[in-house]
A protein has these predicted regions:
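Short coil/turn linker motifs that delimit alpha-helical repeat modules in TPR/alpha-solenoid proteins
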Residues: 19-20, 59-62, 103-107, 127, ...
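Structural register within alpha-helical repeat arrays
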Residues: 31, 71-75, 118, 151, ...
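Solenoidal tandem-repeat scaffolds enriched in leucines and small polar residues
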Residues: 93, 105-120, 124, 128-130, ...
Length: 330
């Protein structure tokens, strides 16, 4: 993108720059932020760590917390650090609580991002009581900081984390979340949320494959590529449930092909789960960070039941001898 190219050029030329160092640090931040959205996450993380390491001998400010919040977000999406992440987030919260009273200009967005990641991390670990406490905390914090969009993020992210527990409740939270995504700045979230709504409706038997496909088309038309390709995985699951293996395989292949989907650990997990059923052959997937979670139970089920001819949506409250598909396809 133009922003990415511009930031890279500015960073390269920074050795000749004699102005305030803060400006160069901000350029680095925007470069790393651009890398995150172009699926170059390791490069991005290196820059975010570089930014935060510069604050060992100086007061922490907005840039520090913004970079730390991005590190927290990347750790969550790495799909490999759930067990250590709550302690890391608590360190962030301690630093914030010390600095905030002294710096009224501190932006709340990074703090709200960190507390949101606490909630979804506990959902990933199946620590539902703690997740519910953080749901309520995040609602209060979003109201306190007058951040309507973060109310939407809270409701949507909570909903996605309970697909394997209560699809009906998840749908209510998704529909509530979408009410907060009606402003132009939240258009991507609105279309993403609409896609999740149609997917959950299908799983509940109240929606249709056609409505989910229309939601995917809207993502395509707006060039929201990651969400668009992830919807192929949703469609693959839906076609499996309909008994249409050929269509399911076609959508799996569409999701696996793009470069942007190659280095994502969560995508790897989902593709292995779907592919094992469609190929009737266990595709190896190992992630020690998931031990003891519902994700791990689903992985074990795929290895035991890969020869099953039918599949069901995994529900943590029920046991099924059929092949279990994780509904958390996002």
């Amino acid at each position: 993108s133009k922003v990415l190219s511009l930031c890279e050029s500015l960073k390269k030329g920074s050795v000749y720059y004699g102005g305030p160092a803060e400006k160069i640090e901000n350029v680095k931040y925007f470069l790393a932020f651009s890398y995150m959205h172009c699926d170059i996450s390791q490069k991005a993380l290196g820059i975010f760590y570089e930014i935060t390491s510069n604050y060992k001998l100086k007061a922490k400010d907005n840039l520090y917390f913004k970079a730390e919040a991005q590190i927290i977000d990347a750790k969550y999406w790495s799909f490999q650090e759930f067990k250590t992440l709550p302690a890391y987030i608590n360190e962030f919260r301690k630093s914030w609580s010390i600095i905030e009273p002294k710096n009224p200009q501190l932006e709340a967005r990074s703090f709200l991002t960190a507390t949101n990641r606490m909630m979804v991390t506990y959902l990933a670990l199946d620590k539902i009581r703690l997740a519910n406490k953080w749901l309520q905390k995040n609602v209060r914090l979003a109201i306190k900081y007058e951040s309507d969009e973060h109310l939407g993020y809270t409701y949507m992210d909570y909903a996605k984390g309970i697909y394997h527990l209560n699809l009906s409740l998840a749908l209510k939270y998704l529909e509530l979340a979408d009410l907060h995504f009606q402003m132009p700045s939240e258009h991507r979230r609105h279309l993403d949320c609409q896609c999740e709504i149609q997917y959950v409706k299908f799983l509940l038997g109240t929606g249709s494959i056609e409505q989910l496909q229309l939601s995917q088309e809207a993502l395509f038309e707006n060039q929201y590529w990651i969400q668009y390709y992830k919807c192929h995985l949703k469609l693959s699951v839906c076609y499996i449930l309909m008994g249409k293996r050929e269509e399911a395989l076609q959508h799996l292949l569409e999701a696996e092909a793009p470069t942007i989907m190659k280095n994502d650990e969560r995508i790897k997990y989902l593709c292995c789960m779907i592919g094992t059923f469609l190929y009737s052959d266990p595709i190896p997937y190992e992630n020690l960070a998931l031990a003891g979670t519902s994700y791990h139970k689903i992985i074990r089920n795929t290895h035991l039941n890969f020869k099953q001819s039918n599949a069901v949506i995994y529900n943590a409250k029920e046991t099924s001898p059929s092949y279990n598909l994780d509904p958390r396809v996002w």
